[in-house]
Amino acid sequence: MAELEAKKVEIVDPAPPAPGPVEAPKEVVADEKAIVAPALPPPAEEKEKPDDSKALVVVETKAPEPADEKKEGSIDRDAVLARVATEKRVSLIKAWEESEKSKAENKAQKKVSAIGAWENSKKANLEAELKKMEEQLEKKKAEYTEKMKNKIALLHKEAEEKRAMIEAKRGEDLLKAEELAAKYRATGTAPKKILGIF
């Protein structure tokens, strides 16, 4: 945090002095031009080198600015220092605000991602449980189907056995009836029970 403040202070410090000196040099430039004009070489030399004189004026306007600031005294310096202190405080507040916002955003994002992970894990557990139940149901269904098929097979077997017994009894009854009929024919007697209808 201290490093960020120091960096921001360094960035802010160069910017504020620029607006202050910009206002002062306009007046100073006029004063310097007035002062510099008599100090110029004779007109003959100016005609020969007009570009050099213009360049000297530009260079001279930049150099005397610190001297004028010293002349103005502690009033401008105090104002500039107060402005720098205010801007420093504002930049520190802004940096703190951005830091707090960033912390809050990161904290919220972390919680949201934690909730997403929790939801995904719970969903995966439920899906695994559902799949397990489906597998158990499929297994039970297969077992039940196998039992039913076995019961059907047993029923079919019993039915076949009963049919076979009925066919065997019918064969025996037919054979017995034929034997009795042959016996009655041979003896010439009539059966005691003729038909149940009569």
Swiss-Prot record:
Domain of life, source organism: Eukaryota
Subcellular location: Cell membrane
Feature: compositional bias, Basic and acidic residues: 1-11
GO aspect biological process, one term: cell-cell signaling
Coiled-coil boundaries: 97-184
MF annotations from Gene Ontology: galacturonate binding
Keyword Phosphoprotein: yes
GO terms for cellular component: plasma membrane
Keyword terms, alphabetized: Cell membrane, Coiled coil, Membrane, Phosphoprotein, Transport
InterPro entries: Remorin_C (IPR005516), Remorin_N (IPR005518)
Family: Belongs to the remorin family.
Reported function: Binds to both simple and complex galacturonides. May be involved in cell-to-cell signaling and molecular transport.
Name the record gives this protein: Remorin
UniProt source species: Solanum tuberosum (Potato)
Lineage: Eukaryota, Viridiplantae, Streptophyta, Embryophyta, Tracheophyta
